[in-house]
Regions:
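TRNA-recognition modules of translation machinery and tRNA-sensing kinases, especially anticodon-binding
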Residues: 1-27, 32
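Domain-level signature for soluble enzymes in the chorismate/prephenate branch of the shikimate pathway
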Residues: 26-216
Length: 216
């Protein structure tokens, strides 16, 4: 995960954005008014993210069990008598965090580098947090090894399922491979298993899902 966290640098960045806007730069942003709003990822990154926020001095008690709330309040505990509500946590999908920050829905956010690169937005990358580490992989069914190459020779393109169309397209283009990208949002592994695509491009932390579905 990357793309935060230092309270001082966040506040400085937000102030700089407001100064730029006052000088005639009308880029989308929230400015320095109201509570600092942080886009927090749900899912596998959540637990480590809460630990990072807490270590940084933020009260995340409401965030640990938000129920159905999408926005919860917090405070900077280092301020001693901080007022509950001086920080807002917006709970989002990791892949959506860059858009929330880039389009003014949050002042800062936490997500994986994969989401940041795929979003391709002009964002200030504050820090790498050192958790949620994954590897990009290209995989196909083991039982159909070599079929992708034969399909490529026959139709002149490789059909690839991925939730990272921008990254995958660039990767194949750099290698001179003509790829037809099939954009999926979940269960990417199904693409080649059911014969819809030749391969997948995805991220993996342990490789367990690949092994369980006989992908190599």
């Amino acid at each position: 995960a990357g793309f935060a966290f230092s309270l001082e640098r966040l506040e400085a960045a937000r102030t700089s954005a407001e100064d730029a806007a006052s000088d005639g730069d009308h880029a989308v942003g929230r400015g320095a008014e109201g509570p600092l709003r942080i886009a927090v990822p749900k899912g596998s990154l959540k637990a480590d993210t809460l630990d990072v926020l807490e270590t940084a001095g933020l009260d995340v008690s409401e965030l640990r069990d938000p129920g159905r709330h999408l926005i919860v309040r917090g405070r900077d505990t280092r301020a001693g008598e901080g007022t509950v509500g001086d920080i807002e946590f917006v709970i989002v999908r990791p892949s959506d965090a860059p858009a929330f920050v880039g389009c003014g829905g949050a002042d800062c956010g936490i997500c994986g580098w994969d989401s940041l690169i795929e979003a391709d937005l002009s964002l200030l990358q504050l820090d790498a947090l050192g958790y949620g580490l994954c590897t990009f992989i290209e995989a196909e069914p083991a039982r159909r090894a070599g079929q992708a190459e034969r399909n490529y020779a026959r139709r002149g393109s490789l059909r690839v399922a991925t939730k990272y169309p921008r990254i995958a397209s660039a990767w194949y283009a750099e290698r001179g491979v003509n790829a037809d990208i099939v954009s999926l949002n979940g269960n990417i592994e199904l693409g080649p298993i059911v014969g819809m695509t030749d391969r997948i491009v995805d991220i993996t932390a342990t490789g367990a899902t690949l092994r369980d579905n006989d992908l190599v």
